[in-house]
Amino acid sequence: MFALVLAVVILPLWTTANKSYVTPTPATRSIGHMSALLREYSDRNMSLKLEAFYPTGFDEELIKSLHWGNDRKHVFLVIVKVNPTTHEGDVGLVIFPKYLLSPYHFKAEHRAPFPAGRFGFLSHPVTPDVSFFDSSFAPYLTTQHLVAFTTFPPNPLVWHLERAETAATAERPFGVSLLPARPTVPKNTILEHKAHFATWDALARHTFFSAEAIITNSTLRIHVPLFGSVWPIRYWATGSVLLTSDSGRVEVNIGVGFMSSLISLSSGPPIELIVVPHTVKLNAVTSDTTWFQLNPPGPDPGPSYRVYLLGRGLDMNFSKHATVDICAYPEESLDYRYHLSMAHTEALRMTTKADQHDINEESYYHIAARIATSIFALSEMGRTTEYFLLDEIVDVQYQLKFLNYILMRIGAGAHPNTISGTSDLIFADPSQLHDELSLLFGQVKPANVDYFISYDEARDQLKTAYALSRGQDHVNALSLARRVIMSIYKGLLVKQNLNATERQALFFASMILLNFREGLENSSRVLDGRTTLLLMTSMCTAAHATQAALNIQEGLAYLNPSKHMFTIPNVYSPCMGSLRTDLTEEIHVMNLLSAIPTRPGLNEVLHTQLDESEIFDAAFKTMMIFTTWTAKDLHILHTHVPEVFTCQDAAARNGEYVLILPAVQGHSYVITRNKPQRGLVYSLADVDVYNPISVVYLSRDTCVSEHGVIETVALPHPDNLKECLYCGSVFLRYLTTGAIMDIIIIDSKDTERQLAAMGNSTIPPFNPDMHGDDSKAVLLFPNGTVVTLLGFERRQAIRMSGQYLGASLGGAFLAVVGFGIIGWMLCGNSRLREYNKIPLT
């Protein structure tokens, strides 16, 4: 086992022209020989890796043997890796200019030496004259590059990468632009100096503000590339973004014409994507002994930028095709929407192959690079046009938060509690915007809290609240999110699909109510989450799942990233926020396949591009998106339904539950096809034995298993009662094949009346006439009672025994006869007959 010992010797080389060489030891010969080879390159920065044997200490004679004649320009850095037992190991020589010993400090100018919008006036960001005593030089003294490993591929011939077909050209220097086109500043408009919320109208209309801050507030910084493998870069910084988790990290530094994106993953080595103006050449730190200086790996410069990719030196698992793709990203477009659209597409496709413990390495690097490039593109677009829009800032902030969560949880396999992200962009102050937004929400009048004007307005407000939230949301934002979800739920009871605006509003409402970090002990927030999960699961009926899957397939089939932006909120479905994991079962996949012909355009695209097996595979993967999104998010489950994890129950963690339904606090219904280990267990009858359905009522305080009996009774009709008798109960429809079809929460008296209407119900799952004989239904009560739903009694009858009923009827009959005789005697035929006296004797 090697121990790492770093011995750094820094010596100026002095003239020893009249002094003889000392007889070298084996180590001296090796080092002296290599120093002689490098003598002629004394004006250049070089580094060298060599094998050698050497004594345990460095004495004066050894140091003197390293002289270079009259050369006074260089110093040696000797880095030693030694085995303490054999005293054998490696020596690395790193040679630096002597003038680095003279401290030199950059003087930051008051403003960047170039105006906005002028690429030709960009300051050269690369500097070779970094002070040896500057803190940015430390990585070069302790670098592992060329000592423990190499950051670059060993063969420089493969460093040159082909320019991708999607990269910018002279005819398209800024790449593609999406529709609608970016708004331009109207004439005579006075630009605000910074982004801020004055009124809610700022969201509905385009609000412009100046990009002058990029010029006046940028600061001069020095960037040390990955492992000190490239000489330092000086640039004017305009912002940074940091995305972290326990298994991944993305660090983005943005400057004027500059970007560095360091992307690392616990399961693989890091990479760094560097973007500089097209005239800039970076110098790699290499062991090369040729006359010319090598540039880091990357394609040829484009019309505006040059891209370099560092890392993955000895790792051949990262394909060259993927490398070329990533290098093309910064030049594909300066429209930030394009890169975010591609990130959403990759994220959606990643969920089709994800498991809760998987790491999707290639997707992780692609999405992270897209996120970084989108920030760079927005910064450069604002600088070149000299303005930004408020909705661009809100859009980017929400995208960073959402994509970071998906990137780390699904891409890196991170624990959700460890996921965090911060942004420090010079052209936007999230803290200030958050305070202004809170002020606007605080001005909402109580009379207006019970409704919202439109889904468009609600979407914009919730999007901004989600984007600028700092862990705790304003009470009125939470109230708006609840109302949006309930309104959409009521609408989906009678229809199967949502329009794009409704999907977007639902997405932001659910994100606000389900994803929060602070206030976990707040019972009202947990209750919000349980209610949201129950409503989302209720909206995810079998019919809606089919339509939602068709929406996703259409979104991907018609995807044209060079024209229109694609985002996950545009195709969001309640199924993505539900706790159903059964939608990949055969019946649901087949329902999707049978529904494809109802959308002729999609049907034509699929059958033109795919064969039958590929179409089936695509349908299966589409349904998998629903099961991966929330149902396997252990953070959400632990936070909102902790009772499924008590008693050391690993069923939820292992994905054994096909459905989870939060009931009253501390209790939940779960459906499983395995033998339950605890809870009140109801086994549904007349179900395929190979696909059984066990409904289990779990309590956080109960660790034993008990079998329950499903009651089969006609339930009282709710029209006879003013109160909602069945509110809080869940209607469950299933097939005798074992397939779960619909789960609907009875939320109000109106929904209860629809349930009791049976064959006259306008809610399709409630109407038995719309389903076959193999369709069955049960009602799950909040207290753990399960009843087979046969029908409802119109009026409540008085229960009496048979003997009592017979005696009552007999007595009534005799009374009627008696009263009839008396009446007949008193009143019968008095007008037709005369009364005769009884004769006397």
Curated annotation (Swiss-Prot):
Compartments where located: Virion membrane; Host cell membrane; Host endosome membrane
Domain of life of the organism encoding this protein: Viruses
Similarity field: Belongs to the herpesviridae glycoprotein H family.
Key words, A-Z: Fusion of virus membrane with host cell membrane, Fusion of virus membrane with host membrane, Glycoprotein, Host cell membrane, Host endosome, Host membrane, Membrane, Sialic acid, Signal, Transmembrane, Transmembrane helix, Viral envelope protein, Viral penetration into host cytoplasm, Virion, Virus entry into host cell
Encoding gene, per UniProt annotation: gH
Membrane topology term: Single-pass type I membrane protein
Glycosylation sites: N18, N45, N217, N317, N499, N522, N760, N783
Pfam families, per the entry: Herpes_glycoH_C, Herpes_glycop_H
Main location: virion
Regions crossing the membrane: 803-823
Stated name of the protein: Envelope glycoprotein H
Keyword Magnesium: no
PTM note: N-glycosylated, O-glycosylated, and sialylated.
Intervals, Intravirion compartment: 824-841
InterPro entries: Herpes_gH, Herpes_glycoH_C, Herpes_glycoH_C_sf
Cellular component GO terms held in the UniProt record: host cell endosome membrane; host cell plasma membrane; membrane; viral envelope; virion membrane
Signal peptide (UniProt feature, chain positions): 1-17
Keyword Glycoprotein: yes
HAMAP family linked: HSV_GH
Virion surface side: 18-802
Subunit organization: Interacts with glycoprotein L (gL); this interaction is necessary for the correct processing and cell surface expression of gH. The heterodimer gH/gL seems to interact with gB trimers during fusion.
Organism whose genome encodes this protein: Varicella-zoster virus (strain Dumas) (HHV-3)
Stored Gene3D superfamilies: 1.20.58.1340, 3.30.500.50, Herpesvirus glycoprotein H, C-terminal domain
Role according to the record: The heterodimer glycoprotein H-glycoprotein L is required for the fusion of viral and plasma membranes leading to virus entry into the host cell. Following initial binding to host receptor, membrane fusion is mediated by the fusion machinery composed of gB and the heterodimer gH/gL. May also be involved in the fusion between the virion envelope and the outer nuclear membrane during virion morphogenesis.
Biological processes, Gene Ontology terms: fusion of virus membrane with host plasma membrane; symbiont entry into host cell
Renumbered residue ranges of the record's region Interaction with gL: 246-309
